[in-house]
């Protein structure tokens, strides 16, 4: 029972860490990355469709993304969707391809993005702590029903705290990496 609670908490904490890493991968840095356009939704014959289903996105150079749209008639719709996003990008058509140059980030914008990333990190830490609280509550319920001893309760809480500390350490490491990436010129 306790091992199931521990495993469940471990899996949920790992999901929190992965969700945070996925979230911050979408924050624009000075470098081009195809994941930057993952959140772009294009109107495809009246249906909102993710860009990655309609085109391939590759890195042309460190500051340019190249989009190869599968259906040529969608070029203007893709450009419009990118411009409408809050990424501050201006795509340009070049025949069948669309190129998206990434402008250099200003110091002010970098600091703003760091604040956003730190806010995301705090949200992820709260999620990890909520998982810890849920696991500890389940163990306390077992103790209350006299299914486990107080020693098992204490041991389980210590294990869950170690998992929490490890997950928060991973979050902090990912945050530090992203901050360093954002501050590079």
Swiss-Prot record:
Subcellular location: Cytoplasm
Cytoplasm as UniProt keyword: yes
Keywords: Cytoplasm, Protein biosynthesis
Gene3D superfamilies associated with the record: 3.30.1360.40, Ribosome-recycling factor
Origin superkingdom: Bacteria
One GO BP annotation of this record: cytoplasmic translational termination
Primary residence: cytoplasm
GO cellular component, one term: cytosol
Molecular function (Gene Ontology), one example: ribosomal large subunit binding
Stated family: Belongs to the RRF family.
Summary of the function given for this chain in its UniProt record: Responsible for the release of ribosomes from messenger RNA at the termination of protein biosynthesis. May increase the efficiency of translation by recycling ribosomes from one round of translation to another.
NCBIfam families noted in UniProt: frr
Protein name listed in UniProt: Ribosome-recycling factor
Organism: Enterobacter sp. (strain 638)
